[in-house]
Amino acid sequence: MAERTDWEAKAANILKAELKRAGVTYAQLVERLAAIGVDEKEVNVRNKLSRGKFTAAYLLQCLTAIGVERLQL
């Protein structure tokens, strides 16, 4: 199995931080993703963030669902 890269870890940490900052749980994220047409299950969200394995498109979908308009790296 491939090891998690620093870039994957950074992407996952950014998304987790934005969820925490907005006070959004994984369950709420699933609901918000559904509202923008993204069908996802809570267990899948948890696994993606835990592994850091998701696409840039998924990151953007999540950030949009959370309501993030600006991101500082």
Segments from the language model and where they lie:
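DNA major-groove recognition helix of helix-turn-helix/homeodomain DNA-binding modules
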Residues: 55-73
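Residues within the alpha-helical elements of helix-turn-helix
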Residues: 32, 36, 65
